[in-house]
């Protein structure tokens, strides 16, 4: 069944919270709801029996947002998503000269400045590209608009696997000709030329913002490896500085050359996706093992100099690209060597073992030791652990896990956050080793339909409102609460605050900006809000 734009009766207009008159608790809450205007279209909700809903999209209908505009001076915008089904709904409030509420006070400290943000995005894997391209052109366009356009959540980062990974339907590298040390047979296969590259171009055309690409390899060609296989325990043959290592470093340059021929240039490359994976016996999918010492020497003697002496010398090099549990030691080993450190722009981290690795002891300590080396979250997904269901359509909890991670990362100096697959099928694939996981967008090819999950909107509460160049500033709470909060100043001088409530309790709060006054509001249980206001 094709969906048309829902009528007012089917989906009543959001009513905001003007009805809250508990003056003793909050004062008059001066928020009024903005009706859906111009291009914005409401969510077409569907429940699959989990904690919240997905928004259903097809070739004729998809929910959308208006291009972001700053509220008038003296007012603030509040964008709300809730477990009960609101999705980035806009209401406006008036900034007060005096505080009327008695709940939690969050005070902006604009002089307390921290890291500048690079951005937010996801990965164009083979699996993501296969799913997106299986949609009709109209539905495909709406999916990419949802992620990249002003009517969507305005991603500005795309991760590109260098050749195959587990989210491929076959194993391949860009040069599977044995002992081709000159890389004469290096070539991009159909996965790049017909799947990923056309979709990346379409995304860039739809985006109003500048979009940065970064690439990560999973495995080298097998003839460069000790075990002669794409997976399992194996490293590069020989040692740093030799023919094997130099050939592997030149493979990076060949990749960048090949994409440049397709008019795509990269912001960064990571030295290796999850280098510890290739140190594990029986590792099931593509990997290439490095210890921190091996990565240090490979960067210092091979990858660093070869990139620097190529036409891609401006491409940034990110080390680690693995669990933050490995910090700060991995950074200490690599960055203690000035020959390696001079080539390293940043440290990329994955989220899978975060429950074993407190942010303060890992990210915080690494920033303390290396304040000039940026931290960047390069991969996250839910559903990968053996006890987890791969896909849970409409899970609010999974959305909260994303936003909690993003806020925690921002509070510990991380400059960007990258989701894993941009889109998967209802099984959580395809994946050649059946390592199925969840994704913010699930594509049902048979119905030419895709589902935008709570994870999509949780990410959007950051990506749409925190453009590249925004700077995190202090936001101090008057007392302990159940809220996760973060504040930033945007390049246009306006301020943005994100408030996540993972508890069931409504939390009355006031946001104070010393430059303009007080914003009285409430954070309902199981909700996320983004606040935006001018500071002058």
Swiss-Prot record:
Pathway(s) this gene product operates in, as recorded in its UniProt entry: Steroid metabolism; cholesterol metabolism; Sphingolipid metabolism
Active site, UniProt feature: 274 (proton donor), 379 (nucleophile)
Sugar-modified residues: 58, 98, 185, 208, 309, 501
Assigned keywords, A-Z: Cholesterol metabolism, Disulfide bond, Glycoprotein, Glycosidase, Glycosyltransferase, Hydrolase, Lipid metabolism, Lysosome, Membrane, Signal, Sphingolipid metabolism, Steroid metabolism, Sterol metabolism, Transferase
Catalysed reactions listed for this entry: a beta-D-glucosyl-(1<->1')-N-acylsphing-4-enine + H2O = an N-acylsphing-4-enine + D-glucose; a beta-D-galactosyl-(1<->1')-N-acylsphing-4-enine + H2O = an N-acylsphing-4-enine + D-galactose; cholesteryl 3-beta-D-glucoside + H2O = cholesterol + D-glucose; a beta-D-glucosyl-(1<->1')-N-acylsphing-4-enine + cholesterol = cholesteryl 3-beta-D-glucoside + an N-acylsphing-4-enine
Keyword field contains Transmembrane helix: no
Catalytic activity, EC: 3.2.1.45, 2.4.1.-, 3.2.1.-, 3.2.1.46
GO molecular function, one term: glucosyltransferase activity
The protein, known as: Lysosomal acid glucosylceramidase
Gene label: GBA1
Single GO BP term: glucosylceramide catabolic process
Pfam families associated with the record: Glyco_hydro_30, Glyco_hydro_30C
Disulfide bonds: 43-55, 57-62
Similarity comment: Belongs to the glycosyl hydrolase 30 family.
Compartments, record wording: Lysosome membrane
Subunit structure: Interacts with saposin-C. Interacts with SCARB2. Interacts with TCP1. Interacts with GRN; this interaction prevents aggregation of GBA1-SCARB2 complex via interaction with HSPA1A upon stress.
Function comment: Glucosylceramidase that catalyzes, within the lysosomal compartment, the hydrolysis of glucosylceramides/GlcCers (such as beta-D-glucosyl-(1<->1')-N-acylsphing-4-enine) into free ceramides (such as N-acylsphing-4-enine) and glucose. Plays a central role in the degradation of complex lipids and the turnover of cellular membranes. Through the production of ceramides, participates in the PKC-activated salvage pathway of ceramide formation. Catalyzes the glucosylation of cholesterol, through a transglucosylation reaction where glucose is transferred from GlcCer to cholesterol.
Topology versus the membrane: Peripheral membrane protein
Signal peptide interval: 1-39
GO cellular component, as recorded: endoplasmic reticulum; Golgi apparatus; lysosomal membrane; lysosome; trans-Golgi network
Broad class of where this protein is predominantly found: membrane
């Amino acid at each position: 069944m094709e969906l048309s734009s829902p009528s007012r009766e089917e989906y009543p207009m959001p009513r905001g919270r003007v009805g809250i008159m508990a003056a003793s608790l909050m004062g008059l809450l001066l928020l009024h709801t903005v009706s859906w205007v111009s291009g914005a279209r409401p969510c077409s909700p569907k429940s699959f029996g989990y904690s919240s809903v997905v928004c259903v999209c097809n070739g004729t209908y998809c929910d959308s947002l208006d291009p972001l505009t700053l509220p008038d001076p003296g007012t603030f915008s509040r964008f709300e998503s809730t477990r009960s089904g609101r999705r980035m709904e806009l209401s406006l409030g008036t900034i007060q000269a005096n505080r009327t509420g008695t709940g939690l006070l969050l005070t902006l400290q604009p002089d307390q400045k921290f890291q500048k943000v690079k951005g937010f995005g996801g990965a164009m894997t083979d699996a993501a590209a296969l799913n997106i391209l299986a949609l009709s052109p109209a539905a495909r366009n709406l999916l990419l608009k949802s992620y990249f356009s002003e009517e969507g959540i305005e991603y500005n980062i795309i991760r590109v696997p260098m050749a195959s990974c587990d989210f491929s339907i076959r194993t391949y590298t860009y040069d599977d000709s044995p002992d081709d040390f000159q890389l004469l047979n290096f070539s991009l296969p159909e996965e790049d030329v017909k799947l990923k590259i056309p979709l990346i171009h379409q995304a860039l055309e739809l985006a109003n913002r500048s979009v940065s690409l970064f690439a990560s390899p999973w495995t080298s060609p097998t003839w460069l490896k000790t075990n002669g296989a794409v997976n399992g325990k194996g490293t590069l043959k020989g040692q740093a500085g030799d023919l094997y290592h130099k050939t592997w470093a030149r493979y990076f340059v060949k990749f960048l050359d090949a994409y440049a021929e397709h008019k795509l240039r990269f912001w960064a490359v990571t030295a290796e996706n999850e280098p510890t994976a290739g140190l594990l016996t029986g590792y099931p999918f593509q990997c290439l093992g490095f210890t921190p010492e091996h990565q240090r020497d490979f960067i210092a003697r091979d990858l660093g100099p070869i990139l620097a002496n190529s036409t891609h010398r401006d491409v940034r090099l990110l080390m680690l690209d693995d669990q933050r549990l490995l910090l700060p030691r991995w950074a200490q080993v690599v960055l203690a060597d000035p020959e390696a450190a001079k080539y390293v722009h940043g440290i990329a981290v994955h989220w899978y073992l975060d429950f074993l690795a407190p942010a303060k002891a890992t990210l915080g300590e690494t920033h303390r030791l290396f304040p000039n080396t940026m931290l960047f979250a390069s991969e996250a997904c839910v559903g990968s652990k053996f006890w987890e269901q791969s896909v849970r359509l409409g899970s609010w909890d999974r959305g909260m896990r994303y936003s909690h991670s993003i806020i925690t990362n921002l509070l510990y100096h991380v400059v960007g956050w990258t989701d894993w697959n941009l889109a998967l099928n209802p099984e959580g694939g395809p994946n050649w080793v059946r390592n199925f996981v969840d994704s913010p967008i699930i594509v049902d090819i048979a119905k030419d339909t895709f589902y935008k999950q709570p994870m999509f909107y949780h990410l959007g509460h950051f990506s749409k409102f925190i453009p590249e160049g925004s700077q995190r500033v202090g936001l101090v709470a008057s007392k302990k609460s159940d809220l996760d909060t973060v504040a930033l100043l945007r390049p246009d001088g306006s301020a943005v605050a994100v408030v996540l409530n993972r508890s069931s309790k409504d939390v009355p709060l006031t946001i104070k900006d010393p430059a303009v006054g007080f914003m009285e509001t409430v954070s309902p249980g199981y909700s996320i809000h983004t606040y935006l206001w001018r500071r002058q």
